[in-house]
Design a protein with these regions (language model features):
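A short, structured active-site edge motif that brings together acidic residues
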Residues: 120-133, 155-161, 224-227
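Acidic (Asp/Glu)-rich catalytic clusters
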Residues: 109-120, 145-150, 204, 237-242
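N-terminal chloroplast transit peptides
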Residues: 1-23
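Beta/alpha (TIM)-barrel catalytic core signal, keyed to glycine-rich beta->alpha loops juxtaposed to Asp/Glu
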Residues: 160-342
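CE4/NodB-like, metal-dependent polysaccharide N-deacetylase domain
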Residues: 138-158, 177-181, 213-215
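Short, acidic/polar
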Residues: 77-87, 134-147
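N-terminal binding-site loop/beta-alpha segment at the start of enzyme catalytic domains
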Residues: 2-4, 13, 43-122, 174, ...
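Short acidic/polar active-site loop segments enriched in Thr and Asp
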Residues: 94, 151-154, 185, 221
Length: 342
């Protein structure tokens, strides 16, 4: 199969090659008229919660940065995606989370391209590979670039740990190659259990040997999971934090299924906030990157109003539970020889 570079039209290669000569930092790209963003590395982030703003970023283990609040597009209709993403960008989000399986990458890309007053360097776009094997992962990177019209993808994740060991290793190799080619800036996984993560570390070491040395196997920059007080995933979180991997939390609002919970409601009343805002603040103070989803303009805005209050340590502790109650699919528990596709 041809290399990543040879499969793209010349115009895209010209754009990508410009990055090595300072394209993304050139003087004509002006910073938005916002307060200077506060940047934290993952290992100190949780202790700095009081300093958070909508412009805050977390430093990844590859030196790049990710906005600490994302706008999720799960189950957003393709025909709505551009409009709602544009609305999210208008109210201050700078981080958009999509996936091949969501079928709304094109709308997200159109909104990002249409945000003429926001430099591309200030916008963070994520997508995910659905079919976990080398060829499909390689093709998915190219398809996402074509559908979105973007010159690069900020973050590409393997959506689930399906595909078998050979498929997972091959898909990861494809992401590493895409990162090396400049098509993808950061890479990672979603819904991997500890056993899948352990296997991936082995694959990374194998790829280093096969591809010519340390660093050639890539590194997990970001990992994404359903995380909230009723699905804490402490074993996975500990594994990732030990390696300074940024953790994203999807379904941080538990699909609204916990509205009216006694503790949650009490905290909302105490702080004069909505239950959704309490859950998002909990996620931020745990050091996670929450990805709330809404297509309602008022809720899109309300989900950003989480920086003018702080939960106490006791609040955070009281909200946590011993429950394991995911509201979405849960591939983290699938065996290493599990399904070949999602």
């Amino acid at each position: 199969m041809a290399s990543f570079g040879t499969r793209f039209p010349k115009s895209r290669l010209q754009v990508l090659s410009a990055s090595s000569s300072g394209f993304f930092n050139s003087s004509h790209l002006q910073k938005p008229k916002l307060n200077h963003p506060i940047t934290f590395s993952a290992h100190i982030f949780r202790t700095m919660a009081s300093a958070l703003t909508l412009q805050s970023k977390q430093k990844l283990n590859n030196g790049l940065e990710i906005p600490v609040l994302g706008y999720g597009l799960w189950k957003t209709a393709p025909e709505e995606a551009e409009e709602v993403t544009t609305e999210a960008l208008k109210v201050g989000y700078r981080h958009v989370d999509s996936a091949a399986s969501y079928r709304n990458e094109a709308g997200a890309g159109a909104a990002i391209r249409g945000a003429k007053d926001i430099p591309r360097s200030e916008l963070f776009f994520t997508s995910k590979v659905r079919y976990i094997n080398y060829d499909d992962a390689k093709d998915q990177v190219e398809e996402t670039l074509e559908k979105t019209g973007l010159a690069y993808i900020n973050l590409m994740l393997l959506h689930c740990p399906y595909g078998g060991s050979e498929g997972r290793k091959g898909a990861w190799k494809a992401l590493v190659e895409a990162q090396e080619a400049g098509l993808v800036k950061s890479i990672g996984v979603s819904n991997y259990g500890v056993h899948h993560l352990d296997e991936l570390e082995t694959h990374i070491k194998e790829l280093e040997e096969e591809r010519g040395g340390k660093g050639k196997g890539g590194a997990i920059n970001v990992a994404q999971y359903e995380i909230h007080p009723w699905c804490a995933r402490n074993d996975i979180v500990q594994w990732l934090q030990k390696r300074n991997v940024a953790i994203e939390a999807y379904s941080p609002l538990v699909r609204g299924e916990r509205w009216g919970d006694k503790t949650l409601k009490a905290l909302a009343d105490k702080h004069g906030k909505s239950e959704a805002q309490i859950l998002l603040r909990w996620s931020l103070q745990k050091g996670y990157i929450p990805l709330p989803k809404s297509v309602t303009p008022t809720r899109i805005l309300d989900n950003t109003k989480i920086y003018d209050f702080q939960l106490s340590d006791e609040d955070v502790k009281n909200l946590e539970t011993d429950e394991y109650s995911p509201v979405c699919w849960d591939p983290t528990v699938s065996p290493l020889d599990g399904p070949k596709s999602g």
